[in-house]
């Protein structure tokens, strides 16, 4: 109810500062009319991402994933990664892992950020990545995602589409936040 008290322009500015999973969460609890008005006023790229997220089943990875993540070609070295992180406008505010992808954008490994930042520039990503990453499908249910995070103590997991291409990520922080809202006190 308090959300509906804000002017649309103010609400759009506030939401634009959030991660896509948080924007989706806020909009799904809004009245339909307000949701449409806010969506219409979001930047076009963000509008597209949120509309897509809202098409996924409410209980699926697609609904709770963040679409801001860092993917890097598996052929890169640490120097290329650092240069990319410094210059790219597409780097999320918070991330814990680099997702190494092949030429088809399929995740083939992960590198925790703290590991990557301690390596010399010439070290190849393929030499330090963990292969066979724990992958979440866009249609996986929340309970399956929870099992994966609990079982493997993940800090983040890549989310893939039906073709296996990387389209998002779920972080342990998002997963924990989600669990807190589902658990009765």
Question: Which stretches of residues belong to each language-model region?
Answer:
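A short, hydrophobic C-terminal helix/tail in secreted or cell-surface proteins
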Residues: 180-185
């Amino acid at each position: 109810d308090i959300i509906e008290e804000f002017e649309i322009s103010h609400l759009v500015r506030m939401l634009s500062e959030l991660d896509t999973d948080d924007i989706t969460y806020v909009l799904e609890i809004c009245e339909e009319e307000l949701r449409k008005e806010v969506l219409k006023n979001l930047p076009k790229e963000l509008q597209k991402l949120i509309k897509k997220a809202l098409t996924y089943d409410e209980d699926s990875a697609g609904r709770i994933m963040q679409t801001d993540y860092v993917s890097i070609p598996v052929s890169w070295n640490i120097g290329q990664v650092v240069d990319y992180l410094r210059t790219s406008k597409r780097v999320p505010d918070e991330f814990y892992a680099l997702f190494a992808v092949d030429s088809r954008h399929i995740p083939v490994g992960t590198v925790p950020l703290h590991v990557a930042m301690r390596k010399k520039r010439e070290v190849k990503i393929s030499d330090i990545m963990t292969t066979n990453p724990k992958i979440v499908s866009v249609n996986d249910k929340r309970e399956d995602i929870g099992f994966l995070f609990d079982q493997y103590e993940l800090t983040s997991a890549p989310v893939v589409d039906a073709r296996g291409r990387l389209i998002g990520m779920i972080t342990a922080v998002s997963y924990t936040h989600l669990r807190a809202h589902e658990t009765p006190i």
